[in-house]
């Protein structure tokens, strides 16, 4: 069926065990899809990424397949996803691969969705009915770079520091 921000998403055991940046989801908790998407965009919540992938596709591996299909549709010729969260690969897993140009293509697609840009430019927001604070991984840039209105940061040892950002100045 059709996916909606109002969908209820039940957290699986697997999603609750994902590390890195997280919102500490617990197995069996239920959230609106909107809340999990907000946590992903604002605070890079890897556990929420897995919960959303499972909700959309049943299994994260099926969602990764959809991610790669969509990347091809967008013309991202040198991108290959092996995870839904971008964390360093575990033993026997491959590292996600992309280029700056391919990430530009993805960013241009995301700009077609105003809610994404609103979330990615939000410095601080609440989660879990106000009991947990989402701090944007871009918070220093949003605060200190005039016109910065969002997108995404990333880091792990093998990939290094990564940034896709947008800014608007003088219209």
Give short role names for the model-derived ranges.
Residues 58-171:
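Penicillin-recognizing serine hydrolase domain
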Residues 1-101, 111:
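Active-site-adjacent loops and short helices of periplasmic peptidoglycan-processing enzymes
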